Amino acid sequence: QIMLFTRFHPKDRHLVFSIVFFLCNTAVCGGNDTFNRGNRELQTKPQTIRIHAQYMEIELNSVETGRLEDALERVINRVSSIFKVIPVKSPLVLKRKGGCFKQWTTGRNKNRCRFYDRKYPAIGEECNKEFKVPSSHLSELSVWGETEEEPLDVRYPQGEGVRDTDFVLYVRAVSSFACTQELSPLAYATYCYQDERGRPMAGYINVCPQNMSSYSTDRLRMILLHEVLHVMGFTRHLFEDFRQCSLTDELSSMCNDSDIRRSPVQIVNGLPRLLTPAVQREAKQHFNCQDVKFGPALQKEGGILSHWNRYQMYGSIMTPNPGPPHLTFLDRMTLAVFEDSGWYTVDYSQAEDFLWGKDEGCKFDLTTSPGHTCILGEHGCHSLHRDRAVCKQLSVEGEHSVFVSEPGMECSKGDNSMAASSLEIFSRQSLCFMSNLTAQNTSQRPAGQCFSHQCQDGTLYVKLRNTGWMECPYGEFIQVENLTGVVLCPGKRDIICLDKENISTVSSSSVGQRHSSDSSKTTTSFIIYSSRAHEFFTNVYILYCSYFVLLLK
């Protein structure tokens, strides 16, 4: 084709040269917005999210303030190790929501402010009617004429913004109306501002000061993590802003649909479910269900709320009112929500093992599993066997009852002199077993008791006070000489010695961390390849155009 073009008459070559130059310049240098936008995105790599905590009104003493700051710093560090975003060009400035009474609807200044809102100076820029956002964090507020290139008046100049930040977290500790409600929450949170792609750019947490002292440091961290995940995306209102493409696919040009995701929440079998690709992938793998419309259910109590279903996801950090920290986990399905938002890339190796409902099938959230059935008020063991527990209803509807651990029921803690029976042992090696063993000649209903345990080559051994080690075959029971009753051994599907051979203790910190799957590694390497390939073909195209222009000359 090049040889044919060189046969043009010299008088026509200027025209051909102009056309070719225009085409080359358009395709490579930015005239084609789709190509150019994709090239920019490929060159913009996600980076660790930078979260800036901005402390506002704090009604705490110095000790509790220090505890809050330390706990939140640890939470922010953990979140930053999990999520990456397209970095904000410094500084981060939040676009004002208020201040303009009417905008231009046509002309060169379309969508710019035409008239000020007279009430705005008195009200100021508020976040969810809770507090005023610092003016130094906000964009300019000005009024424009219909055709002018410069604003007619600048009411508020642009603030200096927040440097080296992708998300601003406003922190308050104020005894608000919400803090005085019946549930007496430790904290609550919401988002304030979003960027042009829908990602939350700012949000706030309010810690209720009157409840602060009653929470342990571990529980404080867990609740703060729960709330931070809310403001970053785990909120029913934000589900509707999720993008059609994950950030990974969008950056690798595997998906070019910039629309928001359509109908992410759907009612299936009477329950609202989050049916987005990564969430469904993780849910199907966890529950061992391949139904097309299977996904984790959301809380439904008077409407669809911003939490997982209490029963199906029992033990997940994003259920309402999470349990004790050592029995609550940041699971893969929760992390998948953020992948599906289209705003973050996620490090799944940071997820914790979540064993509730594992391989229980498609109907686990619809019917009570036989292995998790209990009678209200009955004393037994938590499903992970780390604590004794009491059978309670999980929701006001009373659809499901499970064994719930309460403070003081941990087998790893306690005073051995205060044991419920003289046979119990409280230690880091102790777990909960259903037993009705007694030194008396009376029979009683089995209840949860704490005994020491060992795992050797997958075999479970149990030790009571004043006994030696006894093998406890899965699904069977053992009797002890001179004692009445039995110790019930956990079923084969239980988790005490599962893949943990020769481990003599199970603690909250020793639960195995999930490693990123091979598929995620493949995706990462593909992104690198795709980016390099795109750059390679762009360079070849430039050389092609240059050579063609040279021949024309």
Model-derived features: positions:
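Extracellular mucin-like PTS segments
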Residues: 509-533
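Terminal low-complexity, poorly structured segments
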Residues: 11, 19, 294, 522, ...
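Bacterial N-terminal signal peptides that target proteins for export
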Residues: 6-15, 536-540
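Intrinsic-disorder/low-complexity regions
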Residues: 1, 11, 163, 517, ...
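Cleavable C-terminal sorting propeptides in eukaryotic secreted/cell-surface proteins
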Residues: 527-553
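A detector of low-complexity, intrinsically disordered, Ser/Thr/Gly/Pro/Ala-rich segments
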Residues: 1, 436, 520-526, 536, ...
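Extracellular zinc-dependent metalloprotease catalytic-domain scaffold
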Residues: 21-225, 231-516
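N-terminal signal peptide
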Residues: 4-9, 17-35, 530, 548-553
